[in-house]
């Protein structure tokens, strides 16, 4: 069984060192062959040197790949094209894998009844969690907890397969296509939803996926992401991305108003009421008050993405 681990990276040489150290330290079970590819997405720091200095420690199982087209999706697609293992694993450059990560991958795919897997993201805080942090918006900082049971990824799963801790068979990727480059973060915008788009295609194809609570990665949360400004920007641009997806794949059995699901208006209205109540001192929980404001940013982003935003990036192969 051959696993290719892809790490798309952009100007994070210090965190990349920790990511690579965790992969090197993790136990590789018998029967699993691992190769790691760092995809440098136009970094201006010493990313290449970091990789080159660690090749000997990886005993020839570490590769450097440069991808000049900006965006995580483009970097991932380059990594997929440059590798050939029957499994494609993806982690981010601000993460560390658990010591048993490889073992969990091997166990899952040895059964032969699964096409993709994902797992939890345990936060490693770079600063104290602020009192206004809303637990309904943990996705902003990449905090994922799908519970302590193995469950199927399907229409009833309360989330999606996140692209910073997942493994997909290469055969499945051949069927559903690679990542759509019109979505995903770049150096200019906090666009998102490359994961939502891929997850939608995986489910539509009939691929079988499992959430594994012990397929763990540890995700660093820097202080600059624990600000209200970052939360507002993230929610707006994620809304833009969801609006773009909806423009192409309108949801079924959902009531719309002015091209936007009606429930978004309701959520924003209730949220703004809580925000005003908080400003007047009637809402004592700062997290609830701020969550109310973020619901309005969700709506604003979705409306803009659905009707106005054109990012000008190529569509990529995914889903076209």
Listing of model-derived features with the role each one plays in the protein:
Residues 22, 40-49, 95:
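A conserved acidic beta->alpha catalytic loop
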Residues 88:
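Short aromatic/hydrophobic "clamp" motif used to bind/position activated sugar donors
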Residues 136-159:
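Short, flexible, basic/aromatic active-site loop/helix in glycosyltransferases
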Residues 161, 185-198:
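Acidic donor-binding loop at a coil-to-helix junction in glycosyltransferase catalytic cores
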Residues 233-237, 250-320:
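Non-catalytic, C-terminal membrane-associated alpha-helical segments of glycosyltransferases
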Residues 100-133:
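Conserved donor NDP-sugar-binding/catalytic core segment of glycosyltransferases
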Residues 12-26:
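Short, well-formed alpha-helical segments that are part of the catalytic scaffolds
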Residues 67-83:
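Glycine-rich, basic loop-to-helix element that forms the pyrophosphate-binding segment
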């Amino acid at each position: 069984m051959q696993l290719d681990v892809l790490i798309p990276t952009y100007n994070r040489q210090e965190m990349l060192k920790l990511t690579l150290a965790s992969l090197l330290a993790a136990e590789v079970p018998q029967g699993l062959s691992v190769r790691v590819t760092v995809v440098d997405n136009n970094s201006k720091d010493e990313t290449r040197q970091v990789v080159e200095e660690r090749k000997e420690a990886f005993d020839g199982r570490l590769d450097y790949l440069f991808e000049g087209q900006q965006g995580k999706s483009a970097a991932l697609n380059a990594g997929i094209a440059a590798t050939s293992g029957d499994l494609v694993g993806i982690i981010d450059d601000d993460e560390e894998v658990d010591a048993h990560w490889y073992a969990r991958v091997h166990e899952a795919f040895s059964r032969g009844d699964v096409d993709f897997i994902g797992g939890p993201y345990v936060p490693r805080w770079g600063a104290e969690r602020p009192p206004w942090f809303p637990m309904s918006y943990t996705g902003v900082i990449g905090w994922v907890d799908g519970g302590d049971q193995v469950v199927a990824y399907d229409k009833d799963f309360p989330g999606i397969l996140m692209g910073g801790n997942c493994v997909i068979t290469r055969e499945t990727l051949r069927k559903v296509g690679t990542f759509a480059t019109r979505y995903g973060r770049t150096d200019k915008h906090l666009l998102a939803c490359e994961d939502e788009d891929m997850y939608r295609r995986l489910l539509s194809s009939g691929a079988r996926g499992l959430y594994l609570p012990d397929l763990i990665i540890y995700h660093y949360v820097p202080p600059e992401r624990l600000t209200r400004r970052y939360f507002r920007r993230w929610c707006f641009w994620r809304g833009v991305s969801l609006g773009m997806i909806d423009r192409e794949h309108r949801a079924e059995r959902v009531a719309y108003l002015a091209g936007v699901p009606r429930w978004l208006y309701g959520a924003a209205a209730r949220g703004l009421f809580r925000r005003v109540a908080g400003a007047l001192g009637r809402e004592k929980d700062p997290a609830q008050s701020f969550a109310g404001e973020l619901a309005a940013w969700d709506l604003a982003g979705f409306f803009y993405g659905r009707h106005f935003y054109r990012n000008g990036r190529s569509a990529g192969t995914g889903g076209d």
